[in-house]
């Protein structure tokens, strides 16, 4: 279980959210919602252990992630706004490197991942020669290779076509059905899977100078 406990985040003297607490249990898909500037990306980075909250803590399996960040990151797949891939390598080489860090290399699984994101035929081109959308798909292909139970994804559906979105949403549901956890932000309609998604809204209450959180379940 992932637990956010009394998180407060202040950026540039502005309070984005305050005393924010929630849990994500195995089998859940959770969407963080809110207007631009509400702190969605900041929250994801805090939960991923890539940034510090001004107050509060993040627990993974009842342990503060600060105690063993490396072990926590073994259980986590984080995809941010930047694809986080090496431009001098090909899509296949990028996925080969990623897979070798966490598990035994399986070339067939890499080919399958490339096929899922529509990159068959581009596997031998340097990533620097691919479009921004194609580079994004290289990063997303890691989802088919990752053994991590916890996925934290910042706008994973951006620059993805309708068929690609459907494929990703089906993968999220499959991952959750196996006991995994998916935490994401997106501006896109989750359509048919929205009934499986719990939403946490970072909403401006207007009565306070700080953005607080409210939770709603579809």
From Swiss-Prot:
Record field: catalytic activity: heme b(in) + ATP + H2O = heme b(out) + ADP + phosphate + H(+)
This enzyme's EC code(s): 7.6.2.5
Subunit structure: The complex is composed of two ATP-binding proteins (CcmA) and two transmembrane proteins (CcmB).
GO MF, any single term: ATP hydrolysis activity
UniProt name for this protein: Cytochrome c biogenesis ATP-binding export protein CcmA
Lineage, broadest ranks: Bacteria, Pseudomonadati, Pseudomonadota, Gammaproteobacteria, Enterobacterales
Family: Belongs to the ABC transporter superfamily. CcmA exporter (TC 3.A.1.107) family.
Main location: membrane
Domain of life, source organism: Bacteria
Mode of membrane association: Peripheral membrane protein
Domain ABC transporter: residue ranges: 2-217
Keyword Transcription found: no
Pfam family for this entry, one: ABC_tran
Role this protein plays: Part of the ABC transporter complex CcmAB involved in the biogenesis of c-type cytochromes; once thought to export heme, this seems not to be the case, but its exact role is uncertain. Responsible for energy coupling to the transport system.
Cellular component terms per the entry's GO annotation: plasma membrane
Top EC class of this enzyme: translocase
């Amino acid at each position: 279980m992932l637990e956010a406990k009394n998180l407060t985040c202040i950026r540039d003297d502005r309070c984005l959210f305050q005393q924010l607490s929630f849990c994500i249990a195995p089998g859940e898909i959770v969407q963080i919602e809110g207007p631009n500037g509400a702190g969605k990306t900041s929250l994801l980075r805090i939960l991923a252990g890539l940034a510090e909250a001004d107050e509060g803590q993040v627990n993974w399996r009842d342990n503060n992630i600060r105690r063993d960040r490396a072990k926590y990151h073994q259980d986590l797949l984080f995809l941010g706004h930047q694809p986080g891939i090496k431009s001098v390598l090909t899509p296949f080489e990028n996925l080969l490197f990623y897979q070798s860090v966490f598990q035994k290399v399986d070339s067939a699984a890499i080919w399958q991942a490339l096929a899922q994101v529509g990159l068959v035929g581009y596997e031998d081109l340097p990533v620097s020669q691919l479009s921004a959308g194609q580079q994004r798909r290289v990063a997303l292909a890691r989802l088919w290779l990752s053994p991590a139970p916890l996925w934290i994804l910042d706008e994973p559906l951006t620059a993805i076509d309708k068929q690609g979105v459907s494929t990703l949403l089906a993968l999220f549901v499959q991952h959750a059905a196996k006991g995994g956890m998916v935490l994401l932000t997106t501006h896109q309609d989750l359509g048919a899977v929205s009934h499986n998604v719990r939403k946490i809204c970072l909403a401006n209450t207007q009565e306070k100078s700080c953005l607080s959180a409210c939770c709603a379940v579809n």
